[in-house]
Curated annotation (Swiss-Prot):
<dbReference type="GO" id="GO:0005198">
    <property type="term" value="F:structural molecule activity"/>
</dbReference>
<keyword id="KW-1163">Viral penetration into host nucleus</keyword>
<comment type="subunit">
    <text>Homomultimerizes to form the nucleocapsid. May bind host exportin-1/XPO1. Binds to viral genomic RNA. Protein-RNA contacts are mediated by a combination of electrostatic interactions between positively charged residues and the phosphate backbone and planar interactions between aromatic side chains and bases.</text>
</comment>
<keyword id="KW-0543">Viral nucleoprotein</keyword>
<feature type="short sequence motif" description="Unconventional nuclear localization signal">
    <location>
        <begin position="1"/>
        <end position="18"/>
    </location>
</feature>
<dbReference type="GO" id="GO:1990904">
    <property type="term" value="C:ribonucleoprotein complex"/>
</dbReference>
<dbReference type="Pfam" id="PF00506">
    <property type="entry name" value="Flu_NP"/>
</dbReference>
<keyword id="KW-1160">Virus entry into host cell</keyword>
<dbReference type="GO" id="GO:0042025">
    <property type="term" value="C:host cell nucleus"/>
</dbReference>
<keyword id="KW-0946">Virion</keyword>
<dbReference type="InterPro" id="IPR002141">
    <property type="entry name" value="Flu_NP"/>
</dbReference>
<keyword id="KW-0694">RNA-binding</keyword>
<keyword id="KW-1139">Helical capsid protein</keyword>
<protein>
    <recommendedName>
        <fullName>Nucleoprotein</fullName>
    </recommendedName>
</protein>
<keyword id="KW-0945">Host-virus interaction</keyword>
<feature type="region of interest" description="Disordered">
    <location>
        <begin position="1"/>
        <end position="21"/>
    </location>
</feature>
<dbReference type="GO" id="GO:0019029">
    <property type="term" value="C:helical viral capsid"/>
</dbReference>
């Protein structure tokens, strides 16, 4: 976006801050991640985890989930009002994996939520540190984006599985605030809105009364978030129509699906942040690194540098490929599930393969899985180069009305060509251009038709050596012109909802 007048940068959203200069932002983001690190160290002490066990990503995820659950006020209230069998609303816990006699064993732990909140606040100078919580949510969301497919969720809302590259952040909780809204893809916002409209169609009281007023405010706010992601006037005008509709119904759903399709070529701006597992920040803090003094950024070299010197382990199931498990976590760490594989491979320095070819399941281990044959391995999370994260969507020209990459939502600000079959996309746009949004639809289709596949996105932008922290010498990679690499082709991943 050219106009950054009223917009806050991601880091400001991330730390809940008002407008700050670069140094202040780096300091407050540093404060946020060092709080996460201190909390993690304290939890490892409480649980008496060995150094090795503390570096196990599955243990990190359990500890992260416990603190997120401890601060989930809405759910806590709900659990207290609707007591369910065998669930203590005041407790939280999960599986902790320990090394015993050369084997991994699972131990289920339970803690008072109050106690977890106390440890978290203590690690964060007595504050609630919601920014740190959101940061953990985004890391979990990025991990889900890399691990699961959302075909079923797309189909349920009347969208098309080919729109999977628009679904970033689809598993983020509603309470993830401005930082969460920034990383949600166009498809995710469309899906949330469609679900809302469908409830309104089925439930007459949804928009009525005092609750209905709050619902309406939430609806308009979500519309505005989505509108802010679009970069062309016609797409935004259509969002105004959807937002101002007196009684949102099927016409609005149609408009939203049309907009989601159009975003395959006229890309929305979606933020990308490298959010790492808590254990990585813990390791750095334990080794004496002062994040607040040094400053930290989620979109620059810092996360790459952190991963360069962190050793993280993962449990591996008997027939899984450790290299593939590493790729999954690497993609999650850099929010690169929707990036062009050619770009990811270049930055990582090893070939990144499509999800359909991965011999690995998710990182988390289900409670009914047998631990006997579980092994553990070091995750290879290092990279050959680093690159700046983007939120532009990769449209090519300055009028913002040009081609982005079809099955890709770019993560890195790195020059790439746009190989795409426009005919396959345009086929989805035959037919309906009547109704009150007809002129906007016509305009959007015109812009899409004039998109040229030979264009280049992020012209002149390159990757940087890890020694080049000031980003002075961009290395512009040249990619094989004719194949765009989507992670999702030939997909056989598990569904998120299972």
């Amino acid at each position: 976006m050219a106009s950054q007048g009223t917009k806050r940068s991601y880091e400001q959203m991330e730390t809940g801050g008002e407008r700050q200069n670069a140094t202040e932002i780096r300091a407050s983001v540093g404060r946020m991640v060092s709080g996460i690190g201190r909390f993690y160290i304290q939890m490892c002490t409480e649980l008496k985890l060995s150094d090795y066990e503390g570096r196990l990503i599955q243990n990190s995820i359990t500890i992260e989930r416990m603190v997120l659950s401890a601060f989930d006020e809405r759910r806590n209230r709900y659990l207290e009002e609707h007591p369910s069998a065998g669930k203590d609303p005041k407790k939280t816990g999960g599986p902790i994996y320990r090394r015993r006699d050369g084997k991994w064993v699972r131990e289920l732990i339970l803690y008072d939520k109050e106690e977890i909140r106390r440890i978290w606040r203590q690690a964060n100078n007595g504050e609630d540190a919601t920014a740190g919580l959101t940061h953990l949510m985004i890391w979990h969301s990025n991990l889900n984006d890399a691990t699961y497919q959302r075909t079923r969720a797309l189909v349920r809302t009347g969208m098309d599985p080919r729109m999977c590259s628009l679904m970033q952040g689809s598993t983020l909780p509603r309470r993830s605030g401005a930082a969460g809204a920034a990383v949600k893809g166009v498809g995710t916002m469309v899906m949330e809105l469609i679900r809302m409209i469908k409830r309104g169609i089925n439930d007459r009281n949804f928009w009525r009364g005092e609750n209905g007023r709050r619902t309406r405010i939430a609806y308009e706010r979500m519309c505005n978030i989505l509108k802010g992601k679009f970069q062309t006037a016609a797409q935004r005008a259509m969002m105004d129509q959807v937002r101002e509709s007196r009684n949102p119904g099927n016409a609005e759903i149609e408009d939203l699906i049309f907009l989601a399709r159009s975003a395959l070529i006229l890309r929305g701006s979606v933020a990308h942040k490298s959010c790492l597992p808590a254990c990585v920040y813990g390791l750095a803090v334990a080794s004496g690194y002062d994040f607040e003094r040094e400053g930290y950024s989620l979109v620059g070299i810092d996360p790459f540098r952190l991963l360069q010197n962190s050793q993280v382990f993962s449990l591996i199931r008997p027939n899984e490929n450790p290299a593939h498990k590493s790729q999954l976590v690497w993609m999650a760490c850099h929010s690169a599930a929707f990036e062009d594989l050619r770009v990811s491979s270049f930055i990582r320095g090893t070939r990144v393969v499509p999800r359909g070819q991965l011999s690995t399941r998710g990182v988390q281990i289900a409670s009914n899985e047998n631990m006997e044959a579980m092994d553990s391995n070091t995750l290879e999370l290092r990279s050959r180069y680093w690159a700046i994260r983007t939120r532009s969507g990769g449209n090519t020209n300055q009028q913002r009305a040009s081609a982005g990459q079809i099955s890709v939502q770019p993560t890195f600000s790195v020059q790439r060509n746009l190989p795409f079959e426009r005919s396959t996309i345009m086929a989805a746009f035959t037919g309906n251009t009547e109704g009150r949004t007809s002129d906007m639809r016509t305009e959007i289709i015109r812009m899409m038709e004039s998109a040229r596949p030979e264009d280049v996105s992020f012209q002149g932008r390159g990757v940087f050596e890890l020694s080049d922290e000031k980003a002075t010498n961009p290395i512009v990679p040249s990619f094989d012109m004719n194949n765009e690499g989507s992670y999702f082709f030939g997909d056989n991943a598990e569904e998120y909802d299972n």
